[in-house]
A protein has these predicted regions:
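Outer membrane beta-barrel
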Residues: 27-49, 71-211, 241-244
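Outer-membrane beta-barrel translocator domains and adjoining extracellular loop/strand segments
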Residues: 52-63, 110-123, 152-155, 209-231, ...
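Outer-membrane beta-barrel "beta-signal"
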Residues: 196, 237, 378, 404-416
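Transmembrane beta-barrel strands of outer-membrane/channel proteins
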Residues: 41-49, 100-104, 141, 203-205, ...
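Outer-membrane beta-barrel strand-turn architecture
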Residues: 31, 90-92, 131-134, 193-197, ...
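Residue-level detector of the transmembrane beta-barrel scaffold of outer-membrane proteins
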Residues: 36-42, 97-99, 136-140, 149, ...
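Detector for outer-membrane/organellar transmembrane beta-barrel domains
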Residues: 237-374
Length: 416
């Protein structure tokens, strides 16, 4: 009880310090018996200008990632929203190290309106961990394993990438739908093994998701079949490796992840979503190359599982994607500068039902989304970052329709 009182007292001190010293980089408050309380986060804002071609007629996507015939300027967050996270860590007790994290992810912009009273605050993280010589258990809401590293190793993590909705109040998409599918933050129970010669294995059971589709039928009507009955958890796993070479001048990171989940329709029948993903990162001095990709069935094109994972008949759609990236980071008198170029693409296969509709009425379902990104990411110091990006995106549909969008963005981060 005394430790809890000290922790609450420390929290009160922290709030006071944070209110009067908002630019202090790292604040850690300690209590009695080894308890600690800390915070980390960022505030970011981007200015961006977008020009978009007309969206073709007679095409369908469950989630349109590009604007339609529009020139637009906005000020908004980048791929990362703002972050304000709180961390609590206990002293070691009986060989166990325990901690918890709660992360709030707000966005600075309204939904393209002057007045807004529901600006998005995304509670992405709320979990605790228990570490010991057996490895680690994580319980709560955190980034999912499947394709998690694909997203975290992309250079648009601290950039802008694809915008999604021009009038949106949330964060941008980065390379979501254009190199990987969004792994999302989900409720889970995860076990991670101790490191063994650079290798780790993580296995997790997740709160399952309904598996949803979207497509145009023979009558030209959009149908959205949904398998909503979930009787077992979703399972995800990741095998990863991290190591150094060339006397520490080089680093290597690789990963392989997988997903499996089933769901039933209320009127009978079931669907199965599965996928594999992986990648490798190789760095040497300031140079870094990343190649990652995924393949699966019933996953969707952009948002995983609950958007366009099925065609209009309820059949699982197959798809794959990849991201290729090269960066060079160098020190200069103004700080550290990273120059990068990347190409990412997601592609969906056409089901027999979708082809039949295309032959009959000409409708085209989503075929491919790809983007070329060129970026400059400059750290003035460890807490202040400047970013400039250019993204050239293209979407194709199976009936031959296509659309192109240019996105120019500049932004800044303050991080602690």
């Amino acid at each position: 009880m005394q430790s809890i009182k000290q922790l609450l007292y420390g929290l009160a001190i922290f709030v006071t310090l944070f209110a009067v010293c908002p630019v202090q980089a790292a604040i850690v408050v300690g209590g009695e018996d080894g308890w600690t309380f800390s915070t980390d986060g960022n505030v970011n804002l981007f200015m961006r200008y977008t020009t978009a071609d007309d969206r073709p007629d007679n095409v369908h996507s469950a989630f349109y990632t590009l604007s339609d015939d529009e020139e637009s300027f906005r000020m908004r967050s980048g791929f990362l929203p703002g972050v304000l996270a709180f961390n609590v860590k206990s002293p070691t007790m009986a060989g166990l190290d325990m901690g918890a994290r709660v992360g709030f992810y707000p966005n600075p912009q309204n939904a393209n309106t002057k007045n807004s009273f529901n600006t998005q605050i995304d509670l992405r993280e709320i979990f605790f961990t228990v570490d010991g010589n057996f490895g680690q258990f994580l319980v709560g809401k955190a980034l999912s394993l499947f394709q998690g590293q694909n997203a975290l190793t992309g250079m648009t993590l601290f950039g802008f990438g694809i915008e999604g909705s021009v009038s949106g109040g949330g964060a941008t998409l980065g390379n979501i739908g254009y190199g990987y599918i969004y792994p999302q933050f989900n409720a889970q129970v995860r076990y991670t093994t101790p490191e063994f010669h650079g290798f780790k294995l993580a296995v997790a059971a997740y709160d399952p998701s309904q598996i949803v589709g979207s497509g145009v039928n023979m009558a030209g009507t959009v149908v959205e079949p949904a398998a909503t009955e979930t009787k077992t958890p979703r399972w995800e796993a990741e095998l990863s490796y991290a190591g150094l070479y060339a006397d520490g001048d080089g680093n290597v990171k690789s990963w392989l992840s997988g997903l499996h989940q089933t769901a039933d329709f209320t009127d009978g029948g079931d669907v199965t979503a599965w996928g594999v993903a992986g990648g490798v990162l190789v760095g040497y001095k300031g140079y870094e190359l990343v190649a990652s990709g995924f393949s699966g069935e019933g996953l969707g094109s952009t948002l995983m599982l609950d958007s366009d994972s099925l065609d209009y008949t309820g059949e699982e759609r197959e798809g794959y994607g990849y991201l290729l990236q090269g960066t060079y980071t160098f020190a200069n008198r103004f700080g550290n500068t990273k120059l990068g170029i990347a190409y990412g693409a997601n592609r969906m296969d056409e089901t027999s039902a979708e082809k039949a509709v295309r032959d009959a009425i000409g409708n085209g379902e989503l075929k491919q989304q790809d983007v070329i990104t060129v970026g400059v990411y400059h750290d003035l110091n460890p807490n202040l970052k400047l970013v400039a990006e250019y993204n050239l995106a293209n979407v194709e549909w199976f009936n031959g329709g296509d659309q192109e969008v240019d996105i120019i963005s500049v932004g800044t981060f303050f991080m602690w």
